[in-house]
Each structure stands twice: as C-alpha cells, then as structure tokens.
Curated annotation (Swiss-Prot):
Gene3D superfamilies named in the record: 30s Ribosomal Protein S19, Chain A (3.30.860.10)
Gene label: rpsS
Protein name from the UniProt record: Small ribosomal subunit protein uS19
SUPFAM superfamilies noted in UniProt: Ribosomal protein S19
GO cellular component assignments: cytoplasm; small ribosomal subunit
Lineage: Bacteria, Pseudomonadati, Thermodesulfobacteriota, Desulfuromonadia, Desulfuromonadales
GO molecular function, one term: structural constituent of ribosome
Keywords: Ribonucleoprotein, Ribosomal protein, RNA-binding, rRNA-binding
Record family assignment: Belongs to the universal ribosomal protein uS19 family.
Function summary: Protein S19 forms a complex with S13 that binds strongly to the 16S ribosomal RNA.
Amino acid sequence: MARSIKKGPFIDEHLAKKVLAEGPNSKKIIKTWSRRSTITPDFIGLSFAVHNGRKFVPVYVTENMVGHKLGEFSPTRTFHGHAADRKSKAKR
C-alpha cells in the first residue's frame, strides 16, 4: 500500500536539514543511515553515502530517482550466483 498523498513524502528531519544546508549541485557527500527517506526534487544533483548494513554505498541522485527511497539504490544482499549443475558437466 502506497503512502497517502495527503501526508506527503517521508524524509527524516536530520537528513532534510543537511540537504537544505548543502544547496543544489554540491560536491560534498552526505552520509546517512536513513534508507527510508523518500527522494524529493531538492535532492537532485546531490551525492549521498547510504548505509547498507555493512558499508556506505555512494548514490548520485538524478531526476529519474524522485519518488523512490534512498535504500532502493543501496543493495543489502550480495548475490554470488547459483550453484553449478554437476550432473550435466559429468556427462560430457
């Protein structure tokens, strides 16, 4: 279920203050643990370091990202590939 339009997008207060302090197209990277914050048009052109549980992943915000959450661009799980099929290799 999506968030009500009446409520508006959720942005952590401490993150909103950092974004307003930086200004548009700032080169400084904003470090955050707030994966749940929605990306608004104010974020365009800014760089964030979003924590994925182990390290900070750099995220540069573009127009296409508006409306999504910061956490969507910082994957938390590492995919190492599926196990090889040993039966098909043994027949060759």
